[in-house]
């Protein structure tokens, strides 16, 4: 039996198809922009419901420019960072929520872990993005990844809140840290974000508290773009200019190696 190709029928099938989703676990409220803004915007354009969890606002360690203004309080910094992150998420096409568990140092208890597991259950992500497993310059980042992985495991457990729909085994990717060599991070996946670079850079510009990083992450995207182009072959017709690097945490299961 063949399916109807009429536009109305195709539209009806699309309405009956559940929307795919993905989850980004960001230690601080700007990390998802620098490191995964392209991935978020690209998949949002592909129809994914992209959801970001910011574990903290980065109010202590990631907001130097705001603190230097003087007469600043932690509450004011948090408010500014929240506004920046929400504006960036809107540009990228993502929803965002804030756990506000603090930074420098970041600490997480069992309630935080269960809260994130509940997000997994609610979002049912097709894939997950978070930080590198190591970062000697910022201990908040590996903690975020460990939380992301442990919450994933809990959300897979039948015995956690029995009766709820468990999550499957969404692939987990570590996005690029600030200094990859020291973090023992090596990309095994390049994502072509050329088509959404304008959105990513507009989101980057929302991060007024860390303006010194705007140019740096532009250079990172250009560098990864060159490497992505090299890995598809320099004779390829694909015009890759900007890319994001990712490191997969788990093996991928496939039926085709092409």
Swiss-Prot record:
Belongs to the MshB deacetylase family. The keyword Zinc applies. Its EC number is 4.2.1.83. It comes from Pseudomonas putida (strain ATCC 47054 / DSM 6125 / CFBP 8728 / NCIMB 11950 / KT2440). One of its GO terms (biological process) is gallate catabolic process. The gene is galB. Zn(2+) binds at residues 28, 31, 141. It catalyses: 2-hydroxy-4-oxobutane-1,2,4-tricarboxylate = 4-carboxy-2-hydroxy-cis,cis-muconate + H2O. This is 4-oxalmesaconate hydratase.
């Amino acid at each position: 039996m063949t399916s109807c190709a009429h536009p109305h029928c195709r539209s009806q099938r699309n309405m009956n198809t559940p929307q795919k989703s993905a989850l980004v676990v960001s230690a601080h409220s700007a990390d998802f922009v620098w490191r995964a803004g392209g991935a978020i915007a690209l998949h949002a354009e592909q129809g994914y419901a992209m959801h970001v969890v910011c574990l903290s606002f980065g109010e202590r360690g990631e907001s130097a420019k705001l603190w230097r203004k003087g007469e600043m309080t932690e509450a004011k910094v948090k408010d500014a960072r929240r506004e920046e992150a929400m504006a960036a998420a809107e540009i990228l096409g993502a929803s965002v929520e804030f756990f506000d568990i603090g930074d420098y140092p970041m600490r997480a208890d069992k309630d935080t872990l269960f809260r994130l597991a509940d997000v997994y259950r609610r979002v049912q992500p097709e894939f997950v993005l978070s930080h590198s497993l190591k970062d000697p310059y910022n201990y908040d980042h590996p903690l975020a990844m460990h939380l992301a992985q442990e919450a994933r495991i809990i959300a897979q457990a039948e015995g956690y809140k029995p009766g709820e729909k468990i999550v499957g085994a969404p692939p987990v990717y570590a996005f690029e840290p600030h200094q990859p060599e020291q973090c023992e991070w090596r990309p095994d996946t390049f994502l072509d974000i050329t088509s959404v670079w304008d959105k990513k850079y507009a989101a980057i510009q929302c991060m007024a508290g860390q303006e010194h990083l705007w140019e740096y992450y532009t250079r990172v995207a250009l560098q990864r773009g060159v490497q992505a182009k090299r890995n598809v072959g320099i004779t390829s017709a694909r015009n890759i200019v900007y890319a994001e690097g990712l490191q997969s945490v788990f093996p991928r299961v496939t039926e085709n190696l092409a």
